[in-house]
């Protein structure tokens, strides 16, 4: 089967992606700086390699993609409030880390990069349902970072032929979610 890199693979969403890939027989390399993820989310398996590192650090992305066929890029600081408090730090993680990963993927001839984006790029538009043709209107550094990452991915497809897909997640919740997440209590609100 394939060798896949999952950035942010110790996080809430990433750890579930790793589980699914391993269950289907793929080998997985996880790169996570554990700033928002937890090592306890990572299953122990001979098919899983864990590397604790920051993608924005020089050389890390090149090492991360070495020998992989495709990438699921979930590493980020996924917090609007944190991006408002510390826009430089979140820009480094969400934009510079993504750009480094795309460049390294291009250089390593990775087949495809699938990356997480966010519905936050739509801003406060009341139009429903949301769709990809809508005009982005980011209202926070986090939303802008995700839009920039999408644009970088599209640019790498056009300029270099690197296959990229950006997925705009909406309020994801479930097992392994941090209890401190602003969405962790959403089910109780929906069922009340």
Segments from the language model and where they lie:
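Generic alpha-helical structural context detector
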Residues: 103, 188-192
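N-terminal Rossmann-like NAD(P)+-binding domain of SDR-like oxidoreductases, especially those catalyzing
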Residues: 1-172
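Glycine/proline-rich active-site loop of Rossmann-fold NAD(P)-dependent oxidoreductases
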Residues: 147, 172-188
């Amino acid at each position: 089967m394939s060798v896949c890199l999952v950035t942010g693979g110790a996080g809430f969403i990433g750890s579930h992606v790793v589980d699914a890939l391993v269950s289907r027989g793929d080998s997985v390399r996880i790169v996570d700086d554990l700033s928002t993820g937890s090592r306890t989310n990572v299953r122990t398996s001979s098919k899983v390699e864990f590397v604790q590192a920051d993608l924005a650090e020089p050389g890390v992305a090149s090492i991360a993609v070495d020998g992989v066929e495709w990438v699921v890029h979930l590493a980020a600081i996924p917090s609007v409030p944190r991006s408002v408090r510390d826009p430089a730090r979140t820009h480094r993680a969400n934009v510079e880390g993504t750009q480094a990963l795309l460049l390294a993927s291009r250089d390593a001839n990775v087949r495809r990069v699938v990356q997480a984006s966010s519905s936050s790029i739509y801003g406060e538009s009341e139009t429903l349902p949301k769709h990809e043709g809508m005009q982005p209107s980011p209202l926070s550094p986090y939303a802008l970072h995700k839009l920039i990452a999408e644009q970088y991915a599209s640019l790498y497809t056009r300029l270099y032929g690197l296959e990229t897909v950006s997925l705009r997640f909406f309020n994801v919740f479930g097992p392994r979610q941090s209890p401190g997440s602003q969405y962790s209590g959403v089910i109780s609100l929906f069922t009340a």
